[in-house]
Amino acid sequence: MQKYISEARLLLALAIPVILAQIAQTAMGFVDTVMAGGYSATDMAAVAIGTSIWLPAILFGHGLLLALTPVIAQLNGSGRRERIAHQVRQGFWLAGFVSVLIMLVLWNAGYIIRSMENIDPALADKAVGYLRALLWGAPGYLFFQVARNQCEGLAKTKPGMVMGFIGLLVNIPVNYIFIYGHFGMPELGGVGCGVATAAVYWVMFLAMVSYIKRARSMRDIRNEKGTAKPDPAVMKRLIQLGLPIALALFFEVTLFAVVALLVSPLGIVDVAGHQIALNFSSLMFVLPMSLAAAVTIRVGYRLGQGSTLDAQTAARTGLMVGVCMATLTAIFTVSLREQIALLYNDNPEVVTLAAHLMLLAAVYQISDSIQVIGSGILRGYKDTRSIFYITFTAYWVLGLPSGYILALTDLVVEPMGPAGFWIGFIIGLTSAAIMMMLRMRFLQRLPSAIILQRAAR
């Protein structure tokens, strides 16, 4: 029991800064929305539309680079720290190449925006302008993620938290300058949010690099002198590990976007109630997601040390802590769902629907916690392909079709509206949780030599 308590303390010490960093990131999006809304409703809508396209694109790159964390954690655990710098440099090369692709996609996103049904031309122009300003921040964001993954792979999660709050503090005044046109800058409205956010990502990257160069604990990890050339073998391995994570993230984000589109014809009340419940459940999701990042670090580190039993302990402890957290957040959600809905909207119909949907959200919080922490465990074992297959099957083969049938058809019951999609979420997330646990159990039952051989690849 003592080893589980000790492991839980270590996991929470790693997870809490990640939680706070995620809160800072969420707050940046909130600030952009509020400040753009203060300028005009059209600008706020433009930022929302632009963000809905930016997120899937940038999260694809983000997921690709998540491969660095278990790689660095295992090199650190095995005492091969001299190899970390080369992995990080190749991570920067990979981030640079992916940035170019993302920037090309975002530059041409106007075709998608202008093809939206009944979209106002002025709104479309502002959304395109916002994206074309924001896309210059894509390299800064991905370079920052490489540096952050280096720190987190070495079990240092506080720097990412600090840089997140630096970004938030810089974002507010820079937004103000470019939205309203102060200090000689042009008045850009919502487009100014894109300029500010792009600048903030570069500030966060430069601040993180400055920290890494000065950190005593990383003095033995220095990038190669001169300009290291791309190493095809290392980059190929990072892509093999990261691409399934990137695709899983992409399909998860697009799932919720598709559901939002399917709900939109049902009416204002249904859309508002769905959005409130989804926004709140996304806030609760920060807890298990941050714990999953910590579990990846601990499992990778233990496997690097050559201890499969300690890796199992880290995995099981992460799951136990996650289930405890999810139970508490589910009780909180059920108990205060109406009061929470009132914070967003005071329309009685909207509040009633949102409260009902939050009840369904509380049901899936434990499944959601298990599946996301399970994903973190599998990343620690470098078993990333299974993450993609599981999430795609659970969300797109089981969850979304089930939700569609329940919400919009009478094949099983009378059309349930948004609640049908939320039952689909429950089916999808529960299926993912079961499959993640089965895969973890399969891996942990392999002979130690095979587990360590797979992890060392």
UniProtKB/Swiss-Prot annotation:
What organism, scientifically named, is this protein from? Escherichia coli (strain SMS-3-5 / SECEC)
Q: Does the keyword Lipid biosynthesis apply?
A: no
In which broad location class does this protein mainly occur, judging by the first location in its UniProt entry? Answer: membrane
Record-given protein name:
Multidrug resistance protein MdtK
Q: What range does the record give for the signal peptide?
A: none
Q: What is the top-level taxon of the source organism?
A: Bacteria
> What family is this?
Belongs to the multi antimicrobial extrusion (MATE) (TC 2.A.66.1) family. MdtK subfamily.
Indicate where this protein resides in the cell.
Cell inner membrane
Which gene carries the instructions for this protein? mdtK
Q: Which GO terms describe its molecular function?
A: antiporter activity; xenobiotic transmembrane transporter activity
Q: Which NCBIfam families match?
A: matE
Q: Where are the transmembrane segments?
A: 11-31, 53-73, 93-113, 127-147, 160-180, 189-209, 243-263, 276-296, 314-334, 350-370, 387-407, 418-438
Function, as annotated? Multidrug efflux pump that functions probably as a Na(+)/drug antiporter.
Q: How does it sit in the membrane?
A: Multi-pass membrane protein
